Regions:
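Sec-dependent N-terminal signal peptides of Gram-positive bacterial secreted proteins and lipoproteins
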Residues: 2-24
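Compositionally biased intrinsically disordered regions enriched in Thr/Gly
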Residues: 22-227
Length: 227
């Protein structure tokens, strides 16, 4: 009898360990394409063993893509070249571990006869264990756990931008932008769990600067990218 109970307990423990491993496994991300918009690539996420988190994450992604399509439609519906407006989206998974999933969406709009195409780079960040979306407010907790203080602040981001602008390496910031009073809405995590803030075209700088990507965690001088 004792051997039977011991054997059953061992089997239960093994199943529990396998289930826990599956639950903690990185999410799977596969591309899907909108039938009406073949150039819009949509990431479809599966969190193994966690259908609730899977559903919550995919709902957020679908809402984001749907908003992009509807806002573009609304913006250009009265344009005489509306039938020559091209929309697209691609994505990159920048962080995928047991507690962080970060997906960067690169959206573009090209209108015939326009001066130039528009591009938007947005970060979608999730806790894959719960499916909850991670927003800028949550970064205080991440910073406190990692550094014991908040490094994701408008003041520190202002310092990084001001330093690069002073180096005359190509960053031209519009007058009146600095100091920042708030953080940009868009950010993502890279594979090292560094937080990158994103400034969109024309948000703080001319079009020629592109989308500005600032790594808040790196100690390297190469903390700013033009995308």
């Amino acid at each position: 009898m004792f051997k039977l109970v011991k054997s059953s307990l061992c089997a239960f423990c093994l199943l529990f360990m396998l289930a826990a491993t599956a639950f903690a496994a990185p999410a799977q991300v596969e591309p899907s394409v909108q039938q009406q918009y073949p150039d819009i690539q949509v990431p479809v996420v599966t969190v193994p063993g966690n259908p609730d988190a899977t559903a919550a994450i995919n709902i957020e992604i679908e809402k984001n893509i749907a908003a992009f399509i509807s806002q573009t439609d609304e913006c250009y519906k009265d344009n005489e070249d509306w039938n020559k407006v091209y929309m697209g989206n691609s994505y990159t998974v920048t962080c995928n571990d047991d507690s962080l999933l970060s997906i960067v969406l690169t959206k573009y709009i090209n209108v015939e006869h326009a001066a130039h195409p528009m591009r938007y780079i947005h970060g979608l960040n999730f806790n894959p264990q719960t499916g909850e979306k991670i927003v800028a407010f949550d970064l205080k907790e991440f910073s406190a756990e990692k550094y014991g203080k908040d490094i994701y602040t408008p003041e520190l981001l202002t310092n990084k931008l001001a330093k690069k602008a002073a180096e005359n390496d190509g960053l031209i910031i519009f007058d009146g932008i600095l100091p920042l009073s708030s953080l940009p809405e868009q950010f993502y995590f890279d594979a090292d769990r560094h937080v990158h803030f994103l400034f969109q075209l024309y948000e703080i700088a001319p079009y020629v600067c592109g989308v500005i990507d600032v790594d808040m965690d790196t100690e390297s001088d190469d903390y700013l990218m033009y995308r």
